Amino acid sequence: MADSVPALHPDVAALAPLLGTWVGEGSGEYPTIEPFGYTEEITFGHVGKPFLTYAQRTRAADDGRPLHAETGYLRASAPDRIEWILAHPTGITEIQEGQLTADGDGLRMELVSSSIGRSGSAKEVTDVGRSIELRGDTLTYTLRMAAVGQPLQHHLSAVLRRVR
């Protein structure tokens, strides 16, 4: 029996423009590390349930070594509200909640942490915020972070383009 793609759940219809694979480049900085560049691939998918699946991988721009990964789920809790549930292999979990603004050409999400969990060996992360904008086939984001005694501040930004 051939696998068929289920219909997109109506609760996440406003998030449909995110579906697909995105690749691009970004840069990072934080007071405790040297600035760095990276390449990134993000995939949003769905299984017909009221959430999108999410997988992200980054590599160092200079030598291609793996840097970071995240996986999780993006849910629409109300027509203009979203929840992003994320797990990191560094021992961190995040629940982010925020505002979704959708228009004819794309969407914008403003998210803040409502909960951060960490394993006993994970570095201290106390707050994370994300601003994500989609216009046509271009996805941009910035990430703010409070960690290891530092206040909430800019950490990452990237521009990605849809490849499929």
From Swiss-Prot:
Alphabetized UniProt keyword annotations: Heme, Iron, Isomerase, Metal-binding
Associated pathway: Nitrogen metabolism
Residue ranges of the motif GXWXGXG: 20-26
Record-level Gene Ontology MF annotations: heme binding; metal ion binding; peroxynitrite isomerase activity
Keyword Isomerase recorded: yes
Alphabetical list of CDD domains matching this protein: lipocalin_heme-bd-THAP4-like
Cofactor note: Binds 1 heme b group per subunit, that coordinates a highly solvent-exposed Fe(III) atom.
Main EC class the enzyme belongs to: isomerase
Catalysis performed (reactions): peroxynitrite = nitrate
Annotated EC: 5.99.-.-
Disulfide cross-links: none
Highest taxon of source: Bacteria
Notes on the domains: Forms a 10-stranded antiparallel beta-barrel structure able to accommodate a hydrophobic ligand in its interior. In fact, this fold hosts the heme group, which is located in a wide surface cleft.
Sequence similarity: Belongs to the nitrobindin family.
Known role: Heme-binding protein able to scavenge peroxynitrite and to protect free L-tyrosine against peroxynitrite-mediated nitration, by acting as a peroxynitrite isomerase that converts peroxynitrite to nitrate. Therefore, this protein likely plays a role in peroxynitrite sensing and in the detoxification of reactive nitrogen and oxygen species (RNS and ROS, respectively). Is able to bind nitric oxide (NO) in vitro, but may act as a sensor of peroxynitrite levels in vivo.
Entries under NCBIfam families matching the protein: PeroxynitIsom
Annotated protein name in UniProt: Peroxynitrite isomerase 1
Organism the protein comes from: Mycolicibacterium vanbaalenii (strain DSM 7251 / JCM 13017 / BCRC 16820 / KCTC 9966 / NRRL B-24157 / PYR-1)
